[in-house]
Curated annotation (Swiss-Prot):
Gene Ontology molecular function terms on file: tRNA binding
PANTHER family: TRNA-AMINOACYLATION COFACTOR ARC1 FAMILY MEMBER (PTHR11586), TRNA-BINDING DOMAIN-CONTAINING PROTEIN (PTHR11586:SF37)
GO CC, one annotated term: cytoplasm
Name of the molecule in the record: Probable chaperone CsaA
Species assigned in the record: Bacillus subtilis (strain 168)
Lineage: Bacteria, Bacillati, Bacillota, Bacilli, Bacillales
Length: 110
């Protein structure tokens, strides 16, 4: 069972997608995201398996919520630096978590 101390280890922040493109090299369909997390964290990239509901062009300027303190992972040669969070209503289906009102990039989630 997880305890509050486990949750407090996560650095969860808001960011704005500034670039998105298809990622055909990925084993599972995905989109490469470039996300602005503000001056403290900066620009980070992520591979997100969100192709069932989203197209790259529709993601630009969308705010998302991500864990920013996991170690980077290499996915088909691409360095994924953050884990973008979403709800999973079904197999292969992800709905991005977003603030319901705009907040500054880098805002902590707790």
């Amino acid at each position: 069972m997880a305890v509050i101390d486990d949750f407090e280890k996560l650095d969860i922040r808001t960011g704005t997608i500034v670039k998105a493109e298809e990622f055909p090299e990925a084993r599972v369909p995905a989109i490469k995201l470039v996300i602005d997390f503000g001056t403290e964290i900066g620009i980070k990239q992520s591979s997100a398996q969100i192709t069932k509901r989203y197209k790259p062009e529709g993601l630009i300027n969308k705010q998302v919520i991500a864990v920013v303190n996991f170690p980077p992972r290499r996915i088909a040669g691409f360095k994924s630096e953050v884990l973008v969070l979403g709800g999973i209503p079904g197999q292969g289906d992800v709905v991005l978590l977003q603030p319901d009102q705009p907040v500054p990039n880098g805002t902590k989630i707790g």
